[in-house]
């Protein structure tokens, strides 16, 4: 281990030890400034799997909130009070990190564009590998040299609103209906 990295590692461990001693919870604001440099060395396949995991995690949180809000019972809270309660109970337990605008934007995006989200989920379930399965689509690294792409008039005829079911995917096509995947994931651009 190099001297410089060993010193920095020791410093980081001391900081972590202090956090554990004071039992300070990690705050959601820490994720806004999170250093993601460690992702730069990962392959496209690993990054794609991380994206799948993140989307599945978001789906679970949104499903919990929907289940709570639609179950029968006394919902005496309303407005911001209800939003804070649901956030604390189902999303993150530190109310001081509550950001109403971000939470409303996330929930609104998932609830209003549920068709695109459901389509994306069907692709994700289809793309995840299963034991002894031949259907796992390999993620290929990008080509290292430049190549000019010719204009393809057939692409103009493709509607961005078309929905392709996983069973209709042409697994031998190099693009594998990427345009349909892009239309299904367009809601993520809100973030």
Curated annotation (Swiss-Prot):
Top-rank taxon: Eukaryota
Any further remark recorded for this protein: The sequences of the gene BABR proteins are nearly identical, differing only at their carboxyl ends.
Protein name according to UniProt: Gene BABR protein 1
């Amino acid at each position: 281990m190099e001297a410089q990295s060993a010193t920095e590692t020791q410093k980081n461990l001391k900081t972590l030890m202090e956090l554990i001693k004071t039992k300070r919870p990690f705050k959601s604001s820490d994720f806004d400034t999170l250093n993601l440099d460690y992702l730069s060395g990962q392959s496209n396949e690993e990054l794609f799997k991380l994206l799948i995991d993140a989307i599945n995690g978001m789906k679970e949180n949104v499903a919990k909130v929907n289940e709570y809000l639609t179950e029968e019972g006394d919902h005496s809270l309303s407005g911001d009070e209800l939003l804070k309660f649901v956030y604390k109970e189902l999303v993150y337990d530190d109310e001081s990190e509550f950001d109403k605008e971000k939470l409303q934007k996330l929930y609104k995006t998932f609830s209003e564009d549920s068709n695109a989200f459901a389509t994306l989920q069907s692709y994700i379930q289809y793309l995840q590998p299963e034991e002894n399965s031949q259907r796992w689509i390999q993620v290929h690294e990008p080509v290292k040299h430049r190549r000019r792409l010719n204009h393809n008039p057939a692409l103009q005829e493709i509607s961005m609103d078309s929905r392709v079911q996983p069973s209709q995917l042409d697994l031998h096509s190099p693009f594998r209906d990427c345009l349909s995947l892009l239309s299904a994931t367009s809601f993520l651009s809100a973030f």
